[in-house]
Amino acid sequence: MRSVIQLAHVSLDGFLAGPDGEFDFVVFDDELQDHIYPLVLPVDTAIYGRTTYQLMEGYWPSVLDDPEASAHGRTHARWYASVKKIVASRTLPRTRTPALTIEGDDIVGTIAAAKREPGGDMMIFASPTLTHALAAAGLVDEWRLTWQPVILGGGLPLFGGKEARSRLELRSSRTFRSGVIATHHVVKR
């Protein structure tokens, strides 16, 4: 069965974004990119909430045409263009694009069914509201978090308070020169 992995940058007080949805606190330097991109590239399905998807769709398709884009940026842009995407949204229009599924009614059922299909792992990118629903349904198998050296004092929380108690096994942790700490936890089943 495929795994669902949550990848997110989180403040030390547990927020994925500030009070106005801002991500300006995230340190994403070359050292962290060297760590993150090898984790992302084998994933064959990206899972997004509407807001995160719109941010990604508004940025990554243009990177390949940007002569100033970094090597990391180009690699991720190629991955983004090729990966299957599942988006949780009640407001985005449905699409006939084969590599894009927009699900507004039963995202939990859609992800549960996708886990049973053949393929590589699936990764949730940020998307706090979606993460809350999938974690509450017991569908998140791994947590790959980068703990950012900042306290926001409020914003969009990683956890929504409805998740079932889960025992986790720490598989790895790494501290970066920037003060970011990357952790990899796997849910014990």
PLM features: residue spans?
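Enzymes that bind and transform nitrogen-containing heteroaromatic metabolites
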Residues: M1-R189
